[in-house]
Amino acid sequence: MPEITVRAKSKTYPVYINEFALEDIREKWTKSLAKFSHVFVLTDGHVAELHKAKLDAVLADLPVVTYYVAPNGEEAKTFRVYEDVMTKMIETGLDRKAVLIAFGGGVIGDLGGFVAATYMRGIPFYQVPTTVLAHDSAVGGKVAINHPLGKNMIGNFYQPEAVIYDTQFFATLPERELRSGFAEMIKHALISDLTLLRALMDTFTEPKDFYTKDLTPFLQRGIEIKANIVAQDETEQGVRAYLNFGHTFGHALEAYGNFGKWLHGEAITYGMIYALTMSETIYGLDFDLAEFKTWLEQLGYDTTFDASVPFSKILENMRHDKKTTFNEISMVLLEEIGKPVIFKADDDLIFETYKRVMRKGGNVI
C-alpha cells in the first residue's frame, strides 16, 4: 500500500493512502490500538450515519470503544463542543493511556487533534480522514478550534500517530464537498509545481471528473509537498507559512460568513484568486489568471465575490490572521508559480486588490 512518511521535528509517522487503506492496515492497526486502555472515536453525525459500520468492523475485537458524535460542519469547532467532548471523556473515565481516533473531515480532524493535545496534557491520536479536503488538514499536526473573531485561533501543533486515508469514502461525498477539497490540491500545485498544476487542469475539466478520474496520485503528491515543508518547519516559523496561500483572505471571508456561508475550499479559492491578483501587481506574476478562472468555473467554482461583503469587515478579519504581527498583514504571494514569498501588504494595496476581484467593485462600507 502506498505510504508517505512525515518527518516532523517532534514525531515521524506514516500516511497510508489507497482505496482499501482501512482493510489493508487493519491487523497492524488493531494490534497497536489494543495496547491502549480505551479507544475514543470522535466523529460527526453525517460520517457516523454513512461510515460508522465500516469503522466498527475494524474495531470489533477491541474491548472498550466509545463514540462521540459532534455536530456537522464548522459548528463542531467551538468552545461549547470542545468542552462537551472533554466532559464526555472525563465522565467515561479515559486516562492517559487512552487513544483518540478522529474519524471524519477536516473539522473533525482539527477538533479531535486539539482535544487529544489538551486532554490530560496530551494523549495519542490517529487521523482517519473521510474527505478530499482532509488530505491537507490531517497531515502536519495543526489542530485547532475557532473563535467568533477568527478561524483556528485557539490551537496547537500536535502530530498524530498515523494517518489512515481510505479513499473509498469519497464515493459518498457531494460534489460541493469534493470541489472544496480539490481547492487545497490546487493550492499545493500553485505553491510548488507548474507541471502539477497543468496536470490537474488537463485531467479535471468538469465536475463529474471528481468522481470518474483517479484523485489518489494527486492527493499523494499534495501530501508529499506538505510533508516536505513540515519536515523543514513544523511550527510555521518560516516556509510552512507558504501553505497558507489563499488563506489570509479566505479565512477572513469564512469568519465574515460565520463559518457557514462558504465551505473552506470555496473561501480559499476566492483567497487564491485574490493572492494571484496581488502577485500580478507586486511581482508581475507571469500567469494566465483569466484561463485559470475559466477552468475553475468549468469545475463549478464561483470566481467573483458577492459584492455585499464589506471591505471593513474583511480588513478587520485579516488583521486577526495568525500571520499578522505588529498590526501588519502578511500575504503569501507568488513571484512565479512554485515560488511563494511572504509580503507585508498595506491597507491601500489590500483595498485596491479587493476592488479588482469583487463583483461590481465591492462594498466599501
Curated annotation (Swiss-Prot):
Binds 1 divalent metal cation per subunit. Can use either Co(2+) or Zn(2+). InterPro entries: Dehydroquinate_synthase (IPR050071), DHQ_synth_AroB (IPR016037), DHQ_synth_fam (IPR030963), DHQS/DOIS_N (IPR030960), DHQS_C (IPR056179). GO terms for cellular component: cytoplasm. Its EC number is 4.2.3.4. Pathway: Metabolic intermediate biosynthesis; chorismate biosynthesis; chorismate from D-erythrose 4-phosphate and phosphoenolpyruvate: step 2/7. It is found in: Cytoplasm. It catalyses: 7-phospho-2-dehydro-3-deoxy-D-arabino-heptonate = 3-dehydroquinate + phosphate. Coiled coil: none annotated. CDD domains: DHQS. It comes from the Bacteria. SUPFAM superfamilies: Dehydroquinate synthase-like. Zn(2+) binds at residues 184, 247, 264. Pfam families: DHQ_synthase (PF01761), DHQS_C (PF24621). Its cofactor is NAD(+); Co(2+); Zn(2+). Keywords: Amino-acid biosynthesis, Aromatic amino acid biosynthesis, Cobalt, Cytoplasm, Lyase, Metal-binding, NAD, Nucleotide-binding, Zinc. The keyword Calcium does not apply. The keyword Ribonucleoprotein does not apply. NAD(+) binds at residues 106-110, 130-131, 142, 151, 169-172. Belongs to the sugar phosphate cyclases superfamily. Dehydroquinate synthase family. Catalyzes the conversion of 3-deoxy-D-arabino-heptulosonate 7-phosphate (DAHP) to dehydroquinate (DHQ). This is 3-dehydroquinate synthase. It comes from Listeria monocytogenes serovar 1/2a (strain ATCC BAA-679 / EGD-e).
